[in-house]
Each structure stands twice: as structure tokens, then as C-alpha cells.
């Protein structure tokens, strides 16, 4: 479903992709998975430079609920400096990331099977 959402975003006439990074196919060493887009959006509003229509820039991160939960935990660990056993936590986060990715694939397979019957 992530790639369907990415394709939909790319099809929008007022959205231009500036940069994209696929951390689902190119998983980070710590297990992080997500799809990042830097986009330019043309909107019928004046931008900070006074252009109308205006051009606005945004980052869009597309990921599953499981990926988002993992990213939130990893973010907390990264910025909390008084953690005991950080090596163990990093190892466990990587293991969880791999398990969540396998679960995401299984859930997508189930969804595809359900949709194939309709």
C-alpha cells in the first residue's frame, strides 16, 4: 500500500517531487524503513515571496503503522541520553524492525488475497 500511496502522490498535478528516498527497499543499518519525499506544492495561496499561486515545500514520510511505532521508539532512544544498555536496545530495535517488516509483508499478502476474491 505504501507504493500505491507514493504513486498517487506522484500523480497529483500540483505536486512536484524534488527528492525521494526509499528506505523500504534500501533499509538503513539500524532497521529504519520509510519512504521520504521532498515535494514542491503549488497552491492558490500567496507564498512567503508573494507569488500567487504560491510554491510551498514539504517533507512527506510514508510508512506503515508498525514502521511508525518503531520510528517513534528509536527516536526516543536516540534523544534520551541517560539510557542504560544502549547497545542492547539498538540490537533489540533492529530485531523488532526486521520482525515488523516481515509482519507488514504478511499483512499485505493477506490484503492482496482478500482483494483478489472481490
What are these regions (language model features)?
Residues 1-109:
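Long beta-strand-rich cores associated with HINT superfamily self-processing modules
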Residues 106-118:
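Intrinsically disordered, low-complexity acidic/polar and Pro/Ser/Thr-rich regulatory regions
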